[in-house]
């Protein structure tokens, strides 16, 4: 039996540096969501996000468990990037490196 190689890559902070643009946008949007939907001030939103990150590993999980937050609504409000191609920074040499890998390549992002 012949197996075809499949490479699966995470986009953010693996294939590109998400720190300068993507993550700050998500952080701002999540804080705004918590302020709007839970009536928190900015400090309270940040504190709750840190608490949920430490306890559940993600803000969304904490919101779902404690507030029955609809995950689709939360993600649409906090992870909307209409100009994504402008904020994903190219990594020099990455295209050539990926082309050298035999098989199918799949890129995903949990953001």
Which residues are covered by each model-predicted region?
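Substrate-recognition/cap helix-loop segment adjacent to the acidic, metal-dependent catalytic center
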Residues: 95-111
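N-terminal helical cap/lid subdomain that shapes the substrate entry/recognition surface
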Residues: 2-9, 14-92, 100-103
